[in-house]
Amino acid sequence: TLIKKTAKGEVDAMKKSDVVLWFEELRREDIPLAGGKCANLGELFGQVGVPVPNGFAVSAKAYQMFLKKTKAEKKIEALIADIDMEDLESLQKASQKIRNLVEGLPMPKDMGNAILSSYGLLCKKVGKKPVAVAVRSSATAEDLPGASFAGQQDTFLNVFERSLLKRVKQCWSSLFTPRAIFYRKEKGFSHSEVLISVAVQEMVFSETSGVMFTIDPVSGDTGKIIINASWGLGEAVVSGQVTPDEYLVDKATLRILDKRVFKKDQQIVSDKKGSTKWVTVPKSKQNKSAVSDATIVRLAKYGVQIENHYGVAQDIEWAVDK
């Protein structure tokens, strides 16, 4: 057991110093290293047996190293110290200056190489060159009770190698939106203790996507699963810009209890320029259910698996690829 302990200690020490951590290496207790999003993607990828697109985290340590190596830390602290928190304009100006600073600094060479070579390895693992990826912020404090940082950091879809490092820096700089700066000040967080990781994940070009709740969010009924679905990429549902179809499933029997299908005339799709756009849904699909009964049951089954693993109700973003 002693040898095992040493080996685990070495692995943990390596984990702590790595710029890149693959999902398969991550577990939910790794939130300090990789943020809530990446740690839980790692847990789902390696432990739960549900299909999760592969990817890696640019670690919180990498962000810390970036600030140190580029000497940005002191400049950021000085800019924050000068803010008059009562004055919105002062807050907005400082936020813009900090974001421009972080995004404008060159990525240290060894760090950039580590991220780009991991992207190359992801292409190999997925068996596609090039692979479009989603680049998403994963804040180390976003899932702390009473400190909801969710929605205050950025997500970039349909990213390729040429803009990957730029998008990583934009995720880092999104820690300094006016709202996030103000929020941390209000809650008494030091800006230097809130680190950010970035998820780089194979992008699923979804025909249909949505959100699933393993408990009825309105009534609180723990025996029901609610699934929302719409055409195209999931941002449309998450942002609340379309009215998705809604399916009600009995958790114990996986029987579909109710289906409410709405007109869905707009969807988000990826475009050739490496971003996304809104398009009109073909007329033949606008009033059609976005998922089949078999898919509804399969999703509900995954929902039960995930809830059982975590021991608490979950809300889960999902996608069905083309």
Predicted regions and their residues:
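N-terminal beta-alpha lobe that positions the nucleotide/phosphoryl donor
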Residues: 2-4, 9-199, 208, 279, ...
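Short, electropositive, low-hydrophobicity segments enriched in small/polar residues
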Residues: 39-40, 46, 59, 155, ...
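Short loop/turn segments at secondary-structure transitions that flank enzyme active sites
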Residues: 141, 206, 233-235
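Short conserved micro-motifs at the rims of enzyme active sites and ligand-binding pockets
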Residues: 146-148, 211, 236-239
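Segments forming glycine/polar-rich beta-alpha architectures that bind adenosine-containing cofactors
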Residues: 208-209, 215-216
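Conserved catalytic alpha/beta cores of large enzymes that bind or transform nucleotide phosphates
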Residues: 224-315, 320-321
